[in-house]
A protein has these predicted regions:
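Conserved alpha-helix/loop element of class I SAM-dependent methyltransferases that forms part
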Residues: 23-41
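A short acidic, Gly/Pro-enriched loop at the edge of an enzyme's catalytic core
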Residues: 94-106
Length: 246
């Protein structure tokens, strides 16, 4: 829906440190991942759940020497990416169609919350990583035992609601080493919700050309709820950098 309302095909909430619009925030998030994931020392990257490949295009523009592969289960998004400088693969996160040790980075930028089972993705990511490779995640999480506190987001947040402890257990159980973690929820959810609320009139006009007014009202209520529970630390947004080996 935000693709229609805000004229952007990037499928992330954005990082709102220095960004006035959703597109700017999404670009800022994509650029920050290159720093967090240490792309400067990478050569070959697999972006899992890549959507329209726009973050990958940003990474390629910043470092033209990177060999980047976009992989997504949704063929229509890959097809509509109109990308001729990045390889595109239509496949599932649980069956990555590459040989062992093919990449030095595997990235899941706000996509791993859709992967079921998550453990299978971790196993596959570890398999295709080189011995000195890294798995980099940007993922929404909820506080332990807080499902009932999500309210309307239980309906409108169309993904798994993983907890930080579940993800860390999965990291340990699949043989990864947690090297770096960062909490950025306050720079994601609250400004994202504020952006929608402050620009609701113009965004609503665009949304109701495709969806009903009732759907837009659900979006608006979801934004208010998102801001509320982010301020209460019921939801967070975490970045993880994982080493394949010690």
């Amino acid at each position: 829906m935000m693709k229609i309302g805000a004229d952007t095909k990037m499928l992330n909430f954005g990082l709102w440190k220095n960004s006035p619009t959703l597109y700017d925030a999404q670009k800022e998030m994509s650029q920050y991942i290159t720093e967090f994931g240490e792309f400067n020392s990478a050569k070959k990257i697999l972006d899992v759940g890549s959507g329209f490949c726009i973050p990958a295009t940003i990474w390629k523009e910043k470092n033209p020497k990177l060999d980047i592969f976009c992989m997504d289960l949704n063929f229509s998004e890959l097809k509509n990416g109109n990308n001729h400088i990045i390889s595109q693969i239509n496949s599932s996160s649980s069956e990555i169609p590459f040989f062992d040790k093919s990449f030095d980075r595997v990235i899941a930028l706000e996509s791993a919350q859709h992967f079921v089972p998550l453990e299978r993705f971790f196993v596959e990511a570890r398999r295709v990583l080189s011995d000195d490779g890294k798995l980099v995640l940007a993922i929404p999480v909820i506080k332990e035992g807080s499902l009932l506190k999500l309210g309307i987001l239980n309906i409108t947040w169309l993904s798994k609601k993983y907890t930080e402890s579940y993800i860390k257990d999965t990291i340990k159980n699949t043989g990864f080493i947690l090297r770096k973690e960062e909490s950025i929820g306050s720079m994601v959810y609250e400004p994202f919700a504020d952006y929608y609320i402050q620009n609701r009139k113009s965004l609503k006009e665009k949304l109701i050309t495709t969806y009903s007014k009732r759907i837009e009202d659900l979006v608006f209520r979801s934004m208010k709820k998102m801001k509320e529970i982010s301020e209460k630390k019921i939801i967070d947004y975490l970045l993880f950098s994982l080493d394949k080996s010690s």
